[in-house]
Amino acid sequence: MKTINFITGNKNKLAEVRAIIGNVVDVQNQTVDVPEIQGTIEEIAKEKCRHAANAVGGPVLTEDTALGFHALKGLPGPYIKFFLEALGHEGLNKMLDGFESRGAEAVCTFAFSPGPGSEPILFQGRTEGVIVSPRGPANFGWDPIFEYEGQTYAEMTKEEKNKISHRYKALVKLQQWLVDELS
């Protein structure tokens, strides 16, 4: 079985990735300090993957998540991590007070590189939802405020979330690509 180094320090993301593509590749984990750049979701994902491939010297998988509020024309987008750290769940929810739309799009972009010097390949998944007051456990990013069909990600079981999430949709594309590449 082929091995891929998933570059993350987030144990929850690692568990989700292993649960979804672990039957196709051996997902190992490494933590690499990657510079935070500004740009589009795709530019950020590619640069992060290039940097990780150079640091590891082999095949890597990186992931970047964005949460865009429709009322704010896609913000906070790829900067959601910093907005969450600064404002918390309730603060993110309050950002939409005064707007008609509480709609949001969760975007997950996986980037794969076979190694240094190779152009990263992107796999993207998107899920539409709404921003709500926090519900459910607050142990995984913005899951408590992103509602999909009546439940926040935080209220769902891991199995339920892994069937509909933006991360799942991106990983299915990656999984299919890996199956095609490895056969």
From Swiss-Prot:
SUPFAM superfamilies: ITPase-like (SSF52972). It catalyses: ITP + H2O = IMP + diphosphate + H(+); dITP + H2O = dIMP + diphosphate + H(+); XTP + H2O = XMP + diphosphate + H(+). Mg(2+) binds at E36. Its EC number is 3.6.1.66. NCBIfam families: RdgB/HAM1 family non-canonical purine NTP pyrophosphatase (TIGR00042). Binds 1 divalent metal cation per subunit; can use either Mg(2+) or Mn(2+). Pyrophosphatase that hydrolyzes non-canonical purine nucleotides such as inosine triphosphate (ITP), deoxyinosine triphosphate (dITP) or xanthosine 5'-triphosphate (XTP) to their respective monophosphate derivatives. The enzyme does not distinguish between the deoxy- and ribose forms. Probably excludes non-canonical purines from RNA and DNA precursor pools, thus preventing their incorporation into RNA and DNA and avoiding chromosomal lesions. Homodimer. It is found in: Cytoplasm; Nucleus. Belongs to the HAM1 NTPase family. Keywords: Cytoplasm, Hydrolase, Magnesium, Manganese, Metal-binding, Nucleotide metabolism, Nucleotide-binding, Nucleus. This is Inosine triphosphate pyrophosphatase. Its cofactor is Mg(2+); Mn(2+). It comes from Emericella nidulans (strain FGSC A4 / ATCC 38163 / CBS 112.46 / NRRL 194 / M139). It is an enzyme of class 3 (hydrolase). One of its GO terms (molecular function) is dITP diphosphatase activity. GO terms for biological process: deoxyribonucleoside triphosphate catabolic process; nucleoside triphosphate catabolic process; nucleotide metabolic process. One of its GO terms (cellular component) is nucleus. It comes from the Eukaryota. HAMAP family: HAM1_NTPase. ITP binds at residues 8-13, 48, 64-65, 81, 140-143, 161, 166-167. Its main location: cytoplasm.
